[in-house]
Each structure stands twice: as C-alpha cells, then as structure tokens.
Amino acid sequence: MFPALSSERVLVLIPARMAATRLPGKPLADVGGRPMIVEVARRAAAAAIGPVAVATDSEEIAAAVRAAGVTAVLTRADHPSGSDRIFEALGALDPDGAVDVVVNVQGDLPTIAPQTIRSALAPLAEPAVDIATLCAEIVVEDERTDPNVVKVVGSPLDDNLLRALYFTRATAPFGAGPLYHHIGLYAYRRPALARFVALAPSMLEQREKLEQLRALEAGMRIDVAVVDAVPLGVDTQAHLDRARAILALEAAEQK
C-alpha cells in the first residue's frame, strides 16, 4: 500500500486552505488547465515515494481534488499550522500507524520537480535524523539580505547535506562562503511529527516567525538536503503568472 524508495512506508500530505489574503482562492487558481492544488498533487504522485493526499478545511478544495482522482481529507479549520493539519489527516488516513514517514509538500509549489520532493527523503537515511528538509544555495545577491528568504545555518555533512543548527531571516552565517535558501518542504518521522505538534511554540520560533525552530529548540535533529534550485512559491498574482508561463513552456516542450 505504501511504495517508497526505502523499506519505510511514506505518505505525502499536502495541506491547503482558502484563507490566503494576497491571492484569494489560491489553491484553486488555474495553472496549466488544472487547479494549483491538483497540479501539486500530480507532481507529488510523480515523485513515486508513496500515496498522496490533500488535507484541507475547505469542501470546495476537497471536491476539486477528488474530482481529479486525488484523496482529500477534511480537517478542522482552526489549525495554527500546516503541520497540525497534516497530523490530523495522518490520524484519519492511517489510524493503525502503518506509515513511518510523512512528507509535507506545500500546496503553492505548482512547478516543483518530482525529484526535488524525492530528495527530502535522503537525510532520513541517517536514523538519528528526526526531520528532513531542503535548501538551495543562494545565487541572487539581493536574496542574501532579504528577510523573506529564510536562510539555513548548517554544518556540512557532505557536499549535498547539512545538519541544521539554525534557521533565520537574517543574513547568516557571517563571512566568506555560501548561504542557503531554505525550502519549506519537510519529511517527518512519524514520532517526530507527533512530538512536534505537541510542543508549545518556542521563543525563537515566535521571534523569527519560523516554526521549524520549535523543533531545534526542543533538541530535535533536522538535516537538510541541498538541491539545485528553489521551486517557485505562488503568493502573488505575479508569481501565479510566472507559474503559468513555466507550465506552458513545459507543455510545449513535451509536444
């Protein structure tokens, strides 16, 4: 039931809600002839690491997802984060605990490559890792000082893997060397996800507005796979227009 790249059983969950203020109705915005949330689910399925489901508090999103043949789970509307939403969905889909790893893919990444999603599992080859995530080296100078670009401060384990020491909106670490742009896609060991959502928000999490700091402050280990590029996150109309252009180009190249 749970095919994966390893012996562990993996479930991919995509949290989605209709509450976006900068781009109302974002999950159902048309990209390449599909609702955005459906396009993300299609790419997650192409990663071929396990079943894919959408966790949402919206009947409208659930209906659109199901019409495309994708599993949808209706969740409570009052979750403070996507992590809480996917934890509820995990319990509904897998009450017997068969799933070992939960991959949380953001629903606003309609151009993400399936290989990028697969890369999130790589750090979990180390049994001591609780949570895996992704980053890419910053190559645009302005992003080094942009507080909207979250940086990973990490200790290199090899050329494509870091152990996360901190996440920050500041320009860090200081000095010569690469900076890394964090990509908000996570692979949780199931016990780590359960522990994470049970923790109270931490001081640094509230200060930086970055929930992954809650895990680090609690002593959980986060390792980070380095990928080639940051996938486009859609938050504005300009982002949506760019995503549509990218998908149109992909479609033209496949003809």
Swiss-Prot record:
It comes from Xanthobacter autotrophicus (strain ATCC BAA-1158 / Py2). Disulfide bonds: none annotated. This is 3-deoxy-manno-octulosonate cytidylyltransferase. It is found in: Cytoplasm. GO terms for biological process: CMP-keto-3-deoxy-D-manno-octulosonic acid biosynthetic process; lipopolysaccharide biosynthetic process. It catalyses: 3-deoxy-alpha-D-manno-oct-2-ulosonate + CTP = CMP-3-deoxy-beta-D-manno-octulosonate + diphosphate. SUPFAM superfamilies: Nucleotide-diphospho-sugar transferases (SSF53448). One of its GO terms (molecular function) is 3-deoxy-manno-octulosonate cytidylyltransferase activity. The lineage of its organism: Bacteria, Pseudomonadati, Pseudomonadota, Alphaproteobacteria, Hyphomicrobiales. One of its GO terms (cellular component) is cytosol. The gene is kdsB.
